Amino acid sequence: MRRITYPYSKIGIDNQARHRPMADVILIASNGESVRFEALADTGADFCLFPLNVAKLLGLRLDQLETATTTGVGNASNLTYCDDLTIDLGDGIIFTTRVGFTWGMDRAGFGLLGQQGFFENYNVEFRHRDRIFAIESA
């Protein structure tokens, strides 16, 4: 069983900043391209979702990807491009899952690790008071 512990990251500016469970991940596309990116462990996200510009960094051709419509806070609808990617969390915790890319995440500047692919396969412990969280292979 493998376990990784991450400190919470501070997101935002000045008195608007909040500490959140962020993991430094490596996204690996089937073409072999990879990019390091931050992702929020989000229990409310149905699946893993990243900014659209990450798909471009990975060299993915949007015209060749499956599309879907996703909704988030405020029920805003976003066109989302989907592909299967490998996500490396470090320390040998690696998984392949369907990932969405949408311009709706570009402003956030980070991705989401959601239920499908992530929470369904790993035990995740949040210790908000200590500002740490841990991911453990099941």
Each model region followed by its residue ranges:
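Pepsin/retropepsin-fold aspartyl endopeptidases
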Residues: 1-138
